């Protein structure tokens, strides 16, 4: 006996369960690690500072990531072509060249390719995995056009087109027409002033970066395409929801905040960490603008764009479905064959979706270096403004407490005032800092002497001579990151763009 189709209420319940148990959900270990990485990237205080003591914070995480990015961007974006399609046979040469030109045009011209690549790599280096979303956007683009003095025939010819929508229309009489009227003309000649919008084309490939805090994936997943559940949660205004789903009856009273956890997501520590450096999130409670919150069209709701494998029709075979949910309302429920997200990570862990970020490797070094520098600076303060032993009644304490160049201290007997020795830490601290820099170089593949990568280092025709030009074994770590990005993320993105067109 065949099972019945899943109801909308059952779908919403299933989706909520998948969201709360997914990786990247607010408050889980992945989310906390990414929040901590953002704090280290901004070199924010650790929370263990002592008043009156040094509060120095080292910037190892941000320095290392910012040193790696130029090498990666030079490898991927220094030339005119982000991707090149190779022909299989001689007959494929024209098609391969055309595909190369068109995909590069879509990525660099139709979309902000450089910005996408830069943000993608930054997310991966800092937050374990960088995520981009690529899809075919069927939203119509309309151009505004204005015409004046059209005759009746011209006007009818214009507005009869299916790709034209009239915005404004004014009928005017031609000047001097009464004097020129003949007996055959029973009506005066009229002209038309009209403003229209013309459909400039339907659909294009759209690529956008997905903030790590907005991406969810089922815990057992090894990659995106094989995952049971993937979700992109994003804030949308009521106006945007109505534009996206014009055929749906969207009632603000039934949407709530877009889900039972909407309040928690608005104040998610991981999301707010991105704004913590300049405290730019302090005035809007995590999202939105309080000044416009009362305007209905600008009220914001959490939209969950979910890709779920489920036996929706009850035939015993699961299919991949795209479900867009706001609160308890399902706005879209379609069967699809592709999940439009692509991920890359600098250090891939086999059989696991989330890898390791560069920040994961060196955050402990930043804490140790900060502690050493604080101790070193406190030691220098103590040397410059040390402590003294004073024989009671044998020295003038006011003179001793008054710090001024060339000042004197009146004493009644020699040796009444003696300085307490403060051991110097400089030689040992600097040696330790150099040792930590060496550890950072071996872990992250970057040092203060690194000059980046050869732009030809990763190409297929690389010779033994070119490989020998690598200055140190540490730089091979950066090369491996670049190759990993190319094989697991960039190549897949270009392939998807090609398949969409």
Summary of predicted features, one role per range:
Residues 1-325, 428, 432-435:
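Extended, helix-rich architectural segments
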């Amino acid at each position: 006996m065949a099972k019945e189709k899943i109801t909308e209420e059952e779908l919403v319940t299933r989706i909520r369960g998948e969201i709360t148990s997914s990786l990247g959900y607010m408050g889980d270990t992945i989310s906390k690690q990414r929040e901590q990485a953002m704090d280290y990237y901004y070199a924010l205080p650790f929370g263990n500072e002592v008043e009156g003591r040094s509060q120095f914070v080292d910037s190892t995480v941000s320095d290392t990531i910012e040193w790696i990015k130029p090498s990666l961007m030079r490898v991927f974006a220094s030339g005119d072509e982000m991707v090149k399609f190779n022909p299989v046979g001689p007959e494929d040469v024209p098609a391969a060249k055309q595909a190369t030109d068109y995909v590069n045009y879509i990525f660099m011209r139709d979309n902000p390719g450089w910005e996408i690549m830069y943000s993608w790599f930054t997310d991966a280096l800092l937050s374990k995995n960088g995520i981009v979303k690529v899809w075919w956007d069927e939203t119509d683009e309309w151009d505004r056009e204005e015409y004046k003095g059209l005759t009746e025939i011209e006007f009818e010819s214009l507005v009869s087109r299916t790709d034209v929508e009239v915005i404004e229309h004014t009928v005017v009489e031609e000047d001097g027409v009464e004097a020129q009227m003949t007996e055959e003309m029973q009506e005066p000649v009229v002209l038309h002033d009209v403003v229209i919008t013309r459909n400039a084309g339907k659909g294009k490939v759209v690529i956008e970066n997905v903030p790590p805090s907005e991406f969810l994936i089922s815990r057992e997943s090894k990659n995106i395409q094989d995952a049971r559940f993937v979700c992109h949660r994003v804030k949308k205004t009521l106006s945007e929801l109505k534009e996206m789903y014009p055929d749906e009856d969207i009632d603000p009273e039934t949407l709530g905040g877009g889900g039972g956890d909407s309040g928690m997501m608005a104040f998610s520590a991981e999301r707010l960490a991105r704004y913590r450096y300049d405290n730019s999130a302090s005035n809007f409670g995590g999202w939105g603008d309080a000044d416009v919150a009362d305007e209905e069209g600008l009220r914001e709701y959490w939209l969950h764009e979910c890709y779920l494998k489920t036996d929706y029709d009850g035939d015993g075979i699961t299919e991949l479905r795209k479900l867009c949910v706001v609160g308890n309302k399902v706005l879209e429920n379609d069967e699809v064959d592709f999940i439009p997200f692509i991920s890359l990570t600098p250090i891939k862990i086999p059989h696991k979706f989330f890898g390791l970020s560069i920040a994961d490797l060196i955050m402990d070094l930043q804490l140790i270096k900060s502690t050493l520098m604080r101790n070193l600076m406190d030691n220098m303060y103590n040397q410059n403004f040390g402590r003294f032993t004073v024989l009671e009644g044998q020295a003038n304490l006011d003179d001793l407490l008054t710090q001024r160049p060339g000042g004197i201290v009146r004493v009644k007997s020699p040796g009444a005032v003696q300085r307490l020795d403060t051991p110097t830490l400089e030689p040992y601290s600097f040696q330790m800092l150099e040792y930590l820099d060496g550890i950072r170089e071996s872990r992250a593949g970057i040092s203060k002497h690194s000059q980046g990568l050869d732009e030809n280092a990763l190409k297929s025709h690389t010779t033994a001579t070119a490989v020998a030009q690598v200055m140190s074994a540490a730089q091979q770590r950066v090369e491996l990151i670049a190759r990993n990005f190319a094989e697991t993320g960039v190549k897949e993105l270009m392939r998807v763009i090609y398949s969409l067109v």
